[in-house]
């Protein structure tokens, strides 16, 4: 009798678990616990950790600092739009047409950088340039996304700057509406909403932007879908040879704007169409040695902050903790010795630069204080 009742309850509970889809949660937790138990608690010494990571992926050690002298000469344009291009013949015409067909009285220029393309990208750019006086084209050997953007930064002669990726496109009144908001509010940055689309243009997601003044914390970390006062962009380069080079926006550009108490404004309008690339960096990084670049670029940009007179703060410290969690999401599939080396390096980084901020309020902080790798994994997986 007891056996029959037990079987009945087992069936009932199993049905509830299946109905609520808790079986997936239990399965995930089972594999997570199994993974935790398989980890060794031993950690490498700091020098050994550095050597392990250096053998896995050399640190580019590329600074973002750009020495830019102030000029009293009036800017030639209201806006420079910087478009890095590499093998994008399939999407380039849509991008350029969207930039040219702007309904605005503001004066703007399109700076296109052909970054060593091997398809017809260069020819398309030359044809558009010959037919449109406000398109400037640079042809260069392949230097990567950062190198292409930096070539555009060298040519800036405008009050504001906009970055557009060459497989994306903008709405017809993007330039006019954003510059109007920038001038009326004396804003250092104006950010709009965006739509994420598939490779063939189908809408995946719409992200609205509220109208009005924003805090720095409300900005997305991407250089796109916003316009920025050129003085801030002319003071930086995108670091070369890293993944996640956009980190310079949050760690340097936004920090400079916050330091100057400059205004940040949002327009309640879809401005930008961002094309999702299933073969892009964020999708392929998990299997690449460059996935550890979050560690490298965070360390380099932290050093660069001193060159800009940027100091530590509670907000910056919390951003670093967020970055550490993000790094684990990018490296979790790498070998254990790599993840342990990254943990040791981040631990040294925190203790060297944020000892006064470290507390035991969160699992993540506690893991670094106690040098507890298992706790670190748990925090990165479950702690918000």
Locate each region found by the language model.
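Conserved nucleotide-sugar donor-binding catalytic segment
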Residues: 212-294
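Short, well-formed alpha-helical segments that are part of the catalytic scaffolds
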Residues: 88-101
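Membrane-interface aromatic/basic loop that binds lipid-linked glycans or pyrophosphate carriers
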Residues: 2-64, 117, 333-384
């Amino acid at each position: 009798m007891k056996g029959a009742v037990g079987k009945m309850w087992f069936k009932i509970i199993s049905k509830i678990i299946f109905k609520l889809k808790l079986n997936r949660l239990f399965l995930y937790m089972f594999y997570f616990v199994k993974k935790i138990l398989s980890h060794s608690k031993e950690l490498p010494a700091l020098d050994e950790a550095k050597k392990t990571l250096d053998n896995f992926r050399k640190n580019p050690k590329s600074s973002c600092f750009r020495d830019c002298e102030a000029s009293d000469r009036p800017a030639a344009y209201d806006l420079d739009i910087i478009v890095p291009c590499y093998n994008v013949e399939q999407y380039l015409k849509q991008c350029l047409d969207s930039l040219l067909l702007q309904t605005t009285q503001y004066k703007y220029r399109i700076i296109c950088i052909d970054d060593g393309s091997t398809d017809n990208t260069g020819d398309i750019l030359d044809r558009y340039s010959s037919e449109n006086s406000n398109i400037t084209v640079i042809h260069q050997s392949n230097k990567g996304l950062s190198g292409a953007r930096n070539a555009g930064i060298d040519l800036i002669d405008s009050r504001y700057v906009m970055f557009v990726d060459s497989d994306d496109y903008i709405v017809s009144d993007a330039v006019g509406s954003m510059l109007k908001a920038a001038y009326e509010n004396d804003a250092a940055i104006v950010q709009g909403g965006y739509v994420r689309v598939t490779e063939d243009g189908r809408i995946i997601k719409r992200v609205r932007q509220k109208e009005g003044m924003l805090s720095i914390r409300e900005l997305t970390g991407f250089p796109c879908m916003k316009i920025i006062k050129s003085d801030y962009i002319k003071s930086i380069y995108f670091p070369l040879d890293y993944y996640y080079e956009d980190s310079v926006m949050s760690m340097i550009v936004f920090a400079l704007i916050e330091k100057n108490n400059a205004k940040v404004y949002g327009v309640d309008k879809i401005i930008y169409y961002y094309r999702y690339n299933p073969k892009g960096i964020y999708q392929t990084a998990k299997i690449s040695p460059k996935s550890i670049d979050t560690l490298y670029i965070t360390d380099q940009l932290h050093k660069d902050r001193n060159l800009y007179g940027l100091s530590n703060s509670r907000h910056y410290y919390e951003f670093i903790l967020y970055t550490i969690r993000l790094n684990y999401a990018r490296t979790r599939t790498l070998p254990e010795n790599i993840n342990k080396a990254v943990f040791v390096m981040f631990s040294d980084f925190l203790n060297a630069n944020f000892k006064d901020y470290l507390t035991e309020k969160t699992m993540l902080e506690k893991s670094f204080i106690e040098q507890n790798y298992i706790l670190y994994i748990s925090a990165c997986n479950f702690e918000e």
